[in-house]
């Protein structure tokens, strides 16, 4: 039987460079969606992903929806 709460959450990761840098090549912010396990990862997720606006690998942090 399934439990009441879903353990996996769909989260959004946002580039930290794009959100802080006003002088960038393109307008916009790089965002990725992924899922995380609520029980195993209680704190905010940080992953190093490729940002097409910055053209480099940067740290993407979990944001609130």
Swiss-Prot record:
Entry protein name: Large ribosomal subunit protein bL33c
Keywords assigned by UniProt, alphabetized: Chloroplast, Plastid, Ribonucleoprotein, Ribosomal protein
GO biological process: translation
Pfam families in UniProt: Ribosomal_L33
A molecular-function term among this protein's GO annotations: structural constituent of ribosome
One cellular component term from this protein's GO annotations in UniProt: ribonucleoprotein complex
Subcellular location: Plastid, Chloroplast
Taxonomic lineage of the native organism: Eukaryota, Viridiplantae, Streptophyta, Coleochaetophyceae, Coleochaetales
Record has Transport as a keyword: no
SUPFAM superfamilies per UniProt: Zn-binding ribosomal proteins
Top-level taxon of origin: Eukaryota
Family listed: Belongs to the bacterial ribosomal protein bL33 family.
Organism: Chaetosphaeridium globosum
């Amino acid at each position: 039987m399934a439990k009441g709460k879903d353990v996996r959450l769909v989260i959004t990761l946002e580039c930290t460079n794009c959100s802080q840098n006003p002088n960038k090549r393109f307008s916009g912010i790089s965002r990725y969606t992924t899922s995380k396990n609520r029980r195993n990862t209680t704190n905010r997720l940080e992953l190093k992903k490729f940002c097409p606006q910055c053209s480099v690998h940067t740290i993407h942090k979990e944001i609130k929806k």
